[in-house]
């Protein structure tokens, strides 16, 4: 975006090229400025007078009000010389004394845009012709070579003390680079994701001007800004009465600036003094060589005030006065007419790459949010180090206007450059919005006069730059030699109301002058009170010029005005001094290309950084080559206009702002001081809540909105009073002589006059007839830069330029610091259940867990079934010895008896210790999304992202709140001498002022005829961007974000309930040998042995006697036949018990010896294969054992439904097929019969008991249901993509299992062949897996999409498997 000074440069260049075709200067001597006269009545239009001689220079007139907005860009495109009006020069009127400034004229209509002309060959300098009327703007020619520096002029006498001037504008900018061709505007990009605000980058190049925004409400009155570019000349207003001239005080040394006084009221008009006779005007001679500088003459006594002359050149700026207090805001000014659309400029070169920030971890990008309301203005970044100049790049395309940057830091004042060439008057620019008030700056040194710059092509109007720091007051320079009478300057804007000064001493009453003829309508006055918008009236006819009043106080230098109407040719005069270059002659044939200008030093191309805030212009530098194309910056919102501040020294270039949105049209306000800022607009309505997406990194601020639409035009306010003049400053040193510029291409030879001898300068004669225009001569010496006039009123926005293609992207900045962690996003939708994987291998048995804490005692269960007989008890204590029985004969062993009946159930054993923890069950389905958590803490700042594409324009934002009043800055340095302003209308005669010092006697001129009404002014430059628009409406909800990552594992759950008692263990190893048993009874007597050998004959025995035969026969088993059956019975009982124990430990899965679950069978017989086996989950009697399928691969126990297949047919016809609802198959369609499981000889109650035990013994269950369909949706409807027609399943504990909702109660689908109605059979396999076995088996199903005559379905109930 162009800064204010850029705009001035462009305007000066444009005016230079324009003035080259019509320029006529008048000689004037600086007289004392008289007070401003009152507004006189409108005179009738008088006849043209005879040509008069040039009068002496009058004092500079005060700045006039702003003219209409001028055109920016190249002007010759629509200029057809054949259609131009015949601007013949009129006869020159008598030079009257200087008149008081006229009132402001209304803004002229916008002119047309011209096409660029080719540069002509430079010709010899022809005689200076009369100034022609303003032509349409021509296209900027190629830059000419700098002219040779002129000789220093004679030093003039010190002028009287001038009035205190308004703050001066910044000095001329340095040489402007050659302007590239305008490119087309690029298409506006989509809004990028907002990044966090990066660190301030190095100042970037000035951006191209943004599209004008609509006029916003008036902001708070800003500081006094630098005067804006001159507006086009308005229609002459009626002349006001002339006030009396105050007495001239002796010029004192410049004092310190006093406190600002209040602005005084307009003094009464002084009487018109007598007009001196005009001598005949001689023909314009060839320029004579400049004479030596004479010593300043003593001031003569004050002469009687002369009649009011036409407005003279702007006087040398007086010492800047102290800034007055901030005036109250005036009503809004009317909107100016729209300017023609400017040619698209090329983008500027890319700015230097900003310093990279610390690299952070990149955050995940969030979806682009809706444009947010404009954020508060960021802190001002520090100025970056200036980069060295880059090599010339190709011309860039014009970028989208950037938003206004922050004011840059103040630079130090440069030394005064040598005098530059007088630039051509540029077209009147539109009044830009006031820039932000700058901070007061350090006083800068007065720089030397700069070298003459080459005229650049007029660029598009830029936004007014931020106000720089006011410089210290410079010393007043010596009064220069009187120049030729210049064209009247444009009437400048009314400055803000200054502080009220002390009333001046009343002047002596002068004689009443003759009433002049009726003057032309005066320009618009200052703002009056706000009236209702009236209908624009027709412009009044221009009145006759009244007699001139006495000179008024010195006013601000007016901005360079457009060329005035041509005067009538005068007779040939004496040879004058070397004149300024004459107007351009008729277009010659295309000349040879001139030598190239000096190329600036090539610097390394810096990486592109973010644009810095626009700084004020620096001194004019040498023209550089066209830089590389910059990327179009997004348009930013215009800032709230501040008071016009004093021009500051250049700051660093600010960042380019994001594009603003176009605001609604506001009512046009009246011109005047800035109003108070409007309140910040209400935020836009909130959008509906979207599904919470995963938290992304913090987005950057959204693009700012555009300025609001201008309001209706108010009526002009009354003219404000003029301030008193301040004391003059000390004389400044003359500038150094400029270097000789390169010679321009040779023009066609014009008619050359004979060179006369260098004589004393005679009085100028009247203007001679215009000779044929000579070709363009060498550039004359530059004139002093005049104060720029105040900025013109803001015109309505011109049409948007064609969007240029985006420039090359700058290099990405370094990553910024990592952003803070965003809020946790909502849980994503649970994915569909995958198909069951192959069964895993059985895990090894884990170590036993520690015993859990004992649970509270449960309620007593129902009486259990009689238990199996207990193990044989220990032997009882030994009975007393019975009587010996009679020995029977030994019988044969009897056969083994049948097993006795089972013994009575023994008492329940103690509760076994808890078994080992079972294997972990399969993971449950994802839970439903939890409630939104509290927002996380702010994350660390994210890395600075690359510049996003420009966002779409959002709706207009509401006008921001007005900023506080800025402090008035100190007065600025005096500006260089401005171009001569246009001649103001002659006011009525004022009262005679006190006698002025005697001036040199001028030749008496003849009375001139009033000039014709001026032509329309040039169109204004394109306006600046409007204020930020209201926040846009909330965007549509974004798509649901992707599911979040799995969360961290939850805390360890509490210990589960004690598991069921484990299975009986296998047989243990044999125990140790027990202690010796009780000694057994004696065994029975064995059979008699064989006879022994005969013994020797014994001795003769004594007398024989008897012996006792009895012994302990009861101690020996089986010797006594009566005891043997008892032994066999014991043996059989032992064997039976052993078998029973063995069957308990290793069940066979038969009906007589069922296992508790299939898992027990697999553990007991790992070598067995899967198949159907009998199980008895509730143990006890085997009569209620059930047949189940054992899958030894997975350890699952699967129980089949009694009726597995339900035939396919039309089960249900609805009376109202459109009224769809879920219909339970078992409960409603099938007569209340739910699905049953395993009916082989087991009652429903027994089966329910077995299933209950089975659920207790398992920690995981699963079941599949196959839904056969024809024209019936089972799960997803392919037409709508949703699950609203899915079936519902009823679990065992009356829980309803659905296709969507809480993830714990949702089933999944392995195959979905029932998603469309195509008159074909399909099937959908539904699977439900859970670690809550109490929910299975499935007892019923409720389809929704049934009831039509063509809708059929059937079912296959898969087995329920527990594990």
From Swiss-Prot:
Pyrrolidone carboxylic acid modification, residue list: 23, 78
SMART domains: COLFI
Tissue-level expression: Forms the fibrils of tendon, ligaments and bones. In bones the fibrils are mineralized with calcium hydroxyapatite.
Compositionally biased tracts (Basic and acidic residues): 140-154, 737-746, 1004-1015
Subcellular localization: Secreted, Extracellular space, Extracellular matrix
Residue ranges the record assigns to the propeptide: 23-77, 1118-1363
Post-translational modification as stated in the protein's UniProt record: Prolines at the third position of the tripeptide repeating unit (G-X-Y) are hydroxylated in some or all of the chains. The N-terminus of the mature protein is blocked.
Keyword Repeat included in the entry's annotation: yes
Annotated spans, Disordered: 28-1110
Modified residues (Allysine): 83
Residue numbers binding Ca(2+): 1176, 1178-1179, 1181, 1184
Biased composition (Low complexity): 88-97, 112-128, 224-263, 299-320, 601-610, 674-683, 721-736, 748-794, 842-875, 898-931, 955-965, 986-995, 1036-1049
Modification sites for 5-hydroxylysine: 176
Biased composition (Pro residues): 59-69, 98-110, 322-335, 1051-1060, 1088-1102
Gene3D superfamilies registered for this protein in UniProt: 2.60.120.1000
Annotated glycosylation sites: 176, 1264
GO CC annotation: collagen type I trimer; collagen-containing extracellular matrix; extracellular space; fibrillar collagen trimer
Biased composition (Gly residues): 684-699
Molecular function GO terms recorded: extracellular matrix structural constituent conferring tensile strength; metal ion binding
Pfam families: COLFI (PF01410), Collagen (PF01391)
Function: Type I collagen is a member of group I collagen (fibrillar forming collagen).
Family: Belongs to the fibrillar collagen family.
Subunit (UniProt): Trimers of one alpha 2(I) and two alpha 1(I) chains.
PANTHER family from the UniProt entry: COLLAGEN ALPHA, COLLAGEN TRIPLE HELIX REPEAT
Protein name: Collagen alpha-2(I) chain
């Amino acid at each position: 975006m162009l800064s204010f000074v850029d705009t001035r440069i462009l305007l000066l260049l444009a005016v230079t090229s324009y003035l080259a075709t019509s320029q006529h200067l008048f000689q004037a001597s600086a007289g004392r400025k008289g007070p401003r006269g009152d507004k006189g009545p409108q005179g009738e239009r008088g006849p043209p007078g005879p040509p008069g001689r040039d009068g002496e220079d009058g004092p500079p007139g005060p700045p006039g009000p702003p003219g209409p907005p001028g055109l920016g860009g190249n002007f010759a495109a629509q200029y057809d010389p054949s259609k131009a009006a015949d601007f013949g020069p009129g006869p020159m009127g008598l030079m009257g004394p200087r008149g008081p400034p006229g009132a402001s004229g209304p803004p002229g209509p916008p002119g047309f845009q011209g096409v660029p002309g080719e540069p002509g060959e430079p010709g010899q300098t022809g005689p200076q012709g009369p100034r022609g009327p303003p032509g349409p703007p021509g296209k900027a020619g190629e830059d000419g070579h700098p002219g040779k520096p002129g000789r220093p002029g004679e030093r003039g006498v010190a002028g009287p003390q001038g009035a205190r001037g308004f703050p001066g504008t910044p000095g001329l900018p340095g040489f402007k680079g050659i302007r590239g061709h305008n490119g087309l505007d690029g298409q506006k990009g989509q809004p990028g994701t907002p990044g966090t605000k990066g660190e301030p980058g190095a100042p970037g190049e000035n951006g191209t001007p943004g599209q004008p925004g609509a006029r916003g409400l008036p902001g708070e009155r800003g500081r006094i800004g630098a005067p804006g570019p001159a507006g086009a000349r308005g229609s002459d207003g009626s002349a006001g009465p002339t006030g009396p001239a105050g007495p001239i005080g002796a010029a004192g040394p410049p004092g310190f600036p006093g406190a600002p006084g209040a602005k005084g009221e307009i003094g009464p008009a002084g009487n018109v003094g007598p007009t001196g006779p005009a001598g005949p005007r001689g023909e314009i001679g060839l320029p004579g060589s400049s004479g030596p500088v004479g010593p300043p003459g003593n001031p003569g006594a004050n002469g009687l005030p002369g009649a009011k002359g036409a407005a003279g050149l702007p006087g040398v700026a007086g010492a800047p006065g102290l800034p007055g207090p901030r005036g109250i805001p005036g009503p809004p000014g009317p909107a100016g007419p729209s300017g023609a659309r400017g040619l698209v400029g090329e983008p500027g070169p890319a700015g230097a790459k900003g310093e990279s920030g610390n690299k952070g971890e990149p955050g995940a990008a969030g979806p682009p949010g809706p444009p947010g309301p404009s954020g508060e203005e960021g802190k001002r970044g520090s100025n970056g180090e200036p980069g060295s100049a880059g090599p010339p790049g190709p011309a860039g395309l014009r970028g989208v206007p950037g938003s206004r940057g922050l004011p840059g830091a103040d630079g130090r004042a440069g030394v005064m450059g040598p005098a530059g060439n007088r630039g051509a008057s540029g077209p009147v620019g539109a009044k830009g919005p006031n820039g932000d008030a700058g901070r007061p700056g350090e006083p800068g040194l007065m720089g030397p006069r700069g070298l003459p710059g080459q005229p650049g092509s007029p660029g598009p109007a830029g936004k007014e730059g931020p106000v720089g720091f006011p410089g210290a007051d410079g010393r007043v320079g010596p009064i220069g030699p009187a120049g030729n009478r210049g064209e009247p300057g444009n009437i400048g804007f009314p400055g803000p109301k200054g502080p009220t000064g002390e009333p001046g001493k009343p002047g002596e009453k002068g004689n009443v002058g003759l009433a002049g003829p009726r003057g032309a309508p005066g320009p618009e006055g200052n703002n009056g009170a706000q009236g209702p918008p009236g209908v624009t009236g027709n412009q009044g006819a221009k009145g006759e010029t009244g007699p001139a009043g006495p000179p008024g106080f010195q006013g601000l230098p007016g901005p360079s005005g457009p060329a005035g109407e041509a005067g009538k040719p005068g007779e040939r005069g004496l040879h004058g001094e070397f004149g300024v270059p004459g107007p351009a002659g008729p277009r010659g044939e295309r000349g040879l290309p001139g030598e190239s200008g000096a190329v600036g030093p090539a610097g390394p191309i810096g990486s592109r950084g973010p644009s810095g805030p626009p700084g004020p212009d620096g001194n004019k530098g040498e023209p550089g080559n066209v830089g590389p194309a910059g990327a179009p910056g997004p348009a930013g919102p215009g800032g709230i206009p501040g008071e016009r501040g004093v021009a500051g020294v250049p700051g660093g270039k600010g960042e380019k702002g994001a594009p603003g949105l176009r605001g609604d049209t506001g009512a046009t306000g009246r011109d005047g001081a800035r109003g108070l800022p409007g309140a910040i607009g209400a935020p836009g309505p909130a959008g509906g809540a979207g599904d919470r997406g995963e938290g992304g990194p913090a987005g950057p601020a959204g693009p700012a909105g555009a300025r609001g639409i201008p309001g209706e035009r108010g009526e002009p306010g009354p003219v404000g009073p003029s301030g008193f003049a301040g004391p003059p400053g000390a004389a400044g040193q003359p500038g150094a002589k400029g270097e000789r510029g390169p010679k321009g291409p040779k023009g066609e030879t014009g008619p050359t006059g004979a060179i006369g001898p260098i004589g004393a300068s005679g009085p100028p004669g009247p203007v001679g007839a215009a000779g044929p225009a000579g070709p363009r001569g060498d550039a004359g010496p530059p004139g002093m830069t005049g104060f720029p006039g105040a900025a013109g009123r803001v015109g309505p926005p011109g049409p948007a330029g064609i969007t240029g293609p985006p420039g090359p992207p700058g290099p990405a900045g370094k990553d910024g610091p990592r952003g803070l962690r965003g809020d946790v996003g909502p849980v994503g939708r649970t994915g569909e259940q995958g198909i069951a994987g192959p069964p895993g291998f059985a895990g090894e048995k884990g170590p036993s867990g520690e015993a859990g804490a004992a649970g509270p005692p449960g309620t007593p269960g129902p009486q259990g079934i009689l238990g199996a007989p207990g193990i044989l008890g220990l032997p009882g204590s030994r009975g007393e010895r019975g009587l010996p029985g009679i020995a029977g004969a030994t019988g044969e062993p009897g056969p083994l008896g049948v097993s006795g009946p089972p013994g009575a159930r023994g008492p329940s054993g103690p509760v076994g210790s808890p078994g080992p923890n079972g294997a972990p069950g399969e993971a449950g389905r994802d839970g439903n999304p939890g409630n939104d958590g509290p927002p996380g803490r702010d994350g660390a700042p994210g890395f600075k992202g690359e510049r996003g594409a420009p966002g779409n324009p959002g709706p207009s934002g509401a006008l921001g709140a007005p900023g506080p009043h800025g402090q008035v800055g100190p007065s600025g340095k005096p500006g260089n001498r401005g171009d001569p302003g246009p001649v103001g209308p002659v006011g009525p005669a004022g009262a005679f002022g006190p006698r002025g010092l005697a001036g040199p006697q001028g030749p008496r001129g003849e009375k001139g005829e009033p000039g014709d009404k001026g032509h329309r002014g040039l169109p204004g430059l394109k306006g600046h961007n409007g204020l930020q628009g209201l926040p846009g409406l909330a965007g549509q909800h974004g798509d649901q974000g992707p599911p979040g990552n799995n969360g961290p594992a939850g805390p360890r759950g509490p210990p589960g309930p004690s598991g069921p008692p484990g299975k009986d263990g296998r047989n243990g190893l044999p125990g140790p040998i027990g202690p010796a048993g009780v000694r057994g009874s004696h065994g029975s007597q064995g059979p008699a042995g064989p006879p022994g050998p005969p013994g020797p004959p014994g001795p003769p025995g004594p007398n024989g006697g008897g012996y006792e035969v009895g012994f302990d026969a009861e101690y020996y088993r089986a010797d006594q036949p009566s005891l043997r059956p008892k032994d066999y019975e014991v043996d059989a009982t032992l064997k039976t018990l052993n078998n029973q124990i063995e069957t308990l430990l290793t069940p066979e899965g038969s009906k007589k010896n069922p296992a508790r679950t299939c898992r027990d069978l697999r553990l007991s017989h790992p070598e067995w294969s899967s198949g159907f086996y009998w199980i008895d989950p509730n143990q006890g009697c085997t009569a209620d054992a059930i047949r189940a399928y054992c899958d030894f691969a997975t350890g699952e126990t699967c129980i089949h439904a009694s009726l597995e297949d339900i035939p396919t047919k039309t089960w249900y016809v609805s009376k109202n097929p459109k009224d769809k609802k879920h219909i339970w198959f078992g409960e409603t369609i099938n007569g209340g019969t739910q699905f049953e499981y395993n009916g082989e000889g087991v009652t429903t109650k027994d089966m329910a008991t077995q299933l209950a035990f089975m659920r207790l013994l398992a920690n995981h269950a699963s079941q599949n249901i196959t839904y056969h369909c024809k024209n019936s949706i089972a799960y997803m409807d392919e037409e709508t993509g949703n699950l609203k027609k899915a079936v519902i399943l009823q679990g065992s504990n009356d829980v309803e299992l659905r296709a969507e909702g809480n993830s714990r109660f949702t089933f999944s689908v392995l195959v979905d062949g029932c998603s469309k109605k195509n008159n074909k059979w399909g099937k959908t396999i539904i699977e439900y897996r859970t670690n809550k076995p109490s929910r299975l088996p499935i007892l019923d199903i409720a389809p929704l999409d049934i009831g039509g005559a063509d809708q059929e379905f059937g079912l296959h109930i898969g087995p329920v498997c527990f594990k």
